[in-house]
Amino acid sequence: MNVLVVHGPNLNLLGTREPGIYGVLTLDRINEEISALAEELGCSVSFFQSNSEGAIIDAIQQACGACDGILINPAAYTHTSVAIRDALAAVALPVVEVHLSNIHRREEFRHHSFIAPVAVGQIAGFGADSYLLGLRALFTYIKKEIVTKA
């Protein structure tokens, strides 16, 4: 099983950017934790981070046929990008949306997600653990989907 992990804009600044909201772990450290869990689960992960909407869309499109699912933290694009939402819908892979902070406890403009309607689930508010919970959920979902199709 192959999972693409997509990190959206400004997540490259984790560890220094608003640590009271996003925590002190760097993106590299979060990726290490995701990799360790993936190994434990018996799946492989690849990572992609960009501050560019178009580059994120390209990565999502390239996942079609190469990956079994997508774990995505679209960051600010959660609330603005119909294009990323449409790319996720187009590839028709299982998607889990994750957020470090609880977007529903923050500013009103952060409460709406364009991604949620095309995701199998959303996990928010658990810091870096949101990624680990998301990977476990996606792994379980894909395994059940494989069994159902068999």
Swiss-Prot record:
The record marks 17 as: Transition state stabilizer. CDD domains: DHQase_II (cd00466). Keywords: Amino-acid biosynthesis, Aromatic amino acid biosynthesis, Lyase. InterPro entries: DHquinase_II, DHquinase_II_CS, DHquinase_II_sf. Its EC number is 4.2.1.10. GO terms for biological process: amino acid biosynthetic process; aromatic amino acid family biosynthetic process; chorismate biosynthetic process; quinate catabolic process. One of its GO terms (molecular function) is 3-dehydroquinate dehydratase activity. Pfam families: DHquinase_II. It catalyses: 3-dehydroquinate = 3-dehydroshikimate + H2O. It comes from the Bacteria. Substrate binds at residues 73, 79, 86, 100-101, 110. The active site is at residues 22, 99. Pathway: Metabolic intermediate biosynthesis; chorismate biosynthesis; chorismate from D-erythrose 4-phosphate and phosphoenolpyruvate: step 3/7. Belongs to the type-II 3-dehydroquinase family. Catalyzes a trans-dehydration via an enolate intermediate. Homododecamer. This is 3-dehydroquinate dehydratase. It comes from Geobacter metallireducens (strain ATCC 53774 / DSM 7210 / GS-15).
